[in-house]
Amino acid sequence: GGRLFIALNHAIGLLDHPNNGYINSTGVEDMLEKKGLKIRNDFIIDNNCGVCNFEQQYGYLKFQRSVSFPYCPVITNFSKHTITYGLRSMLLMFASSIEQIKTPTPYIFTPLAQSSSISGVQQAPVCFDLEKQWTQRDFNRPHNIVAALLTNDDNNSAIVTITDADFLINQSAIDGHTDNITFALNSIEWLADNSGLIQLRNKFTTFPVLEPVGDTSREVLKYINFLLPILIILGIAFYRYKRNLRKREDRSHPGYID
């Protein structure tokens, strides 16, 4: 018997290192697989995602850029369960997909949260490209499970698993913009069999989810993001050039006082 809440960093992403992603096997995966829950060696990608901020340099100028980052899926598909009651969204970072497999154990598998209808997976290892232009073809496997529940009525045991251990400490969770913390609290409370308090505590926090952006719109936004700072600088330079030119012309007139 026993009851567990497992948040597992199975997929590891290193953006500021050699820009790669790999699988970190801890041994917990083998235990879960024997009970009917398999964590795949992949990275979930989702068109409904968070953003990644990075610094880009144009000559002597440095700019902060924000780009959509499909490896940070925004999860809005939840099953009907006490644990997910009242949840609207969660933001994950480098999550792997979960699947149910047949085993001789009496554990019952229940999906709790899935990626969107425009999502997919990339097999590890992964090399991240922040400049990649994502298309519909990249999101070729929808509704990937990111959190699931295993229950065994014979010994009253249960295990809640989510494939991101950092979902409680990412900035979105800290700011309260998503239901990451609520999911963890609901899970622990349900596992402790205090489910009557869950409905009282749920806050129905809403995270605004943007509509999927088409390829054409992405391309337009990309060029606006690239060209706008340059055009502003050129505009300022042209304005100062014209102003200085006008001053020089005025100084050439008799009686001019600066």
Locate each region found by the language model.
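Intrinsically disordered or highly flexible coil/loop and linker segments, enriched in small
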Residues: 193-200, 233-236, 240, 248
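Acidic, S/T/G-rich, low-cysteine, solvent-exposed domains in lumenal/extracellular/periplasmic regions
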Residues: 1-196
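Juxtamembrane/interface motifs at transmembrane-helix termini
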Residues: 21, 26, 219, 253-255
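A glycine-rich phosphate-binding loop feature that marks nucleotide/adenosyl-phosphate handling sites
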Residues: 47-52, 203-206, 256
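Short, aromatic-rich amphipathic segments at membrane interfaces
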Residues: 167, 174, 199-225
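Hydrophobic alpha-helical membrane-insertion segments
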Residues: 18, 172-173, 238, 246-249
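Cytoplasmic C-terminal tails of single-pass
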Residues: 247-258
